[in-house]
Amino acid sequence: MRRILSILLIMFCFCVSQGQEFRCNVSVNYQKLMTTTQAYESGGDKKVFENMKQALEDFINGTKWTNIEFEQQEKIECSFSLILNQRTSATDFVGQITIQMKRPVYNSTYTTGLFNYMEQPNFQFAYNESMPLEFDLNNFSSLLSSTLAYYCYVMLGMYFDSYSLYGGQPFYETAQQVVQAVDVAKYSGWDSKGGRNRYWFMENHINSAYSDLREAYYNYHRLGLDMMTKDQPKARQAIIAALQNLQRAHKRSTSMLSLQQFVDVKIQEIVSIFTPAPDQEKKQVYELIKDISPINVVKLKGFNTK
């Protein structure tokens, strides 16, 4: 924790670094291609998919995404799952991405979910196992590498926001650059059309109108979870403050993708934290969740006290 906080003080300084930022586990599920006629010719060639998994893992874990030096034990734990639904040519695929990330909680062995997001099942991309994945922020290389880079910067933004107020700003700005470099006329999911895509997920974090969402990450994690072993009542109040942040953000936009992602990831944890809390706090949490994410109210059984 102390090293993470010290990193935040020097994160804008250039330094030579040895280790990369992520410890990401990648899985590629190709079962549909083995059992349907959608598989293109060599759709049953397992080696292609094994190479794809390794290429994605090497790209995420081997790329230097920041100028910050991470020790081995400080690397960010995440997972990237790709379910392949179609293979339309030797190098063209359609699939669905799921990304998850965890964050350690100070002075404990507990890790908390920070990001858990499943995209729509229409991710179209090209992968040629004879060509390495490359990424250049200034020049578009491929949809696959840009998508991976986008989520790496988003995860860095969330991670550092959870340690320092608006600490993830430079990474969100870089993710925005990735979005802007993609040809939206050619690739879907990167422009303002629709509400559940990469453009809007980034807009929710980069637009100052939704700063309460960013503050919620800090209040919930740094002032809440990280302080649980020191002062539980005060830590719970910080988590309530985070929910109030989300409530204010929700009032500005009732369809914020990032806000719903936050609540979906945290709801079971919130239940565990406030189950032993005073009834007044339970009632307060219930009313906030009812306003922010009505679909999750059913998980707060017993919180609506009289």
Predicted feature residues:
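Soluble non-cytosolic domains of exported or imported proteins
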Residues: 43-51, 142-147, 257
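Acidic/His-rich structured neighborhood in mature extracellular/periplasmic domains
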Residues: 89-203
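Start-of-domain marker
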Residues: 20-94, 107
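Sec-exported extracytoplasmic/periplasmic mature domains
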Residues: 57-65, 157-161, 271, 275
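Flexible, glycine-rich surface segments
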Residues: 164-255
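Bacterial Sec-dependent N-terminal signal peptides
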Residues: 1-24
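A cross-kingdom marker for long, charged
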Residues: 25-29, 217-306
